[in-house]
């Protein structure tokens, strides 16, 4: 679902009406998937955190389906430049009871293949080797029921800084640098208000807002740079014999 998020020409009625085509796409899959059916759905980030109807749809997903795995994909692997995407892996109902339509999700496993990874594209192709660590920890069971343990430190994950977030509260420092972690349905409900935008590693290229100067200091610095640039431009115009034009701009 990579068209515009909002749009018209939605011809069917959903349980949670919305003009967001991406959220309608998710509802369509949840409703039409046969009991016991499996899905792996690529969605943009906003599907994981959008409020209102988005929250309702995620609750429906975790209620009616066993959402067992989320793969956070790196940027640059789709045509839309810079789009951030994820893969949701889920089964309609549960393996024990495919017709179950309540409380189907217990634990959600998340693999972060995005943080501190290159931006992929023609010059840096995304290859099978980049997915190999995820395939290993996912296991052979297609329903996500293979024995799993937290902890996977490929692509220099152990060198990553840990974000100051809910995801890292009461978590071992070494475990917090893993790309592969488990979060309970209850934690998602209480700590994230049913947002599935779950991340815990700190991107080395990100800017720490806490270390930035106060807004008035930033504004003063910006103004000083603008005044200096205008002065240099004024001097250049006069050197070029355009003093009258420079005076007219004052």
Language-model features and meaning:
Residues 1-250:
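A conserved structural/catalytic subdomain of Rossmann-like adenosyl-cofactor enzymes
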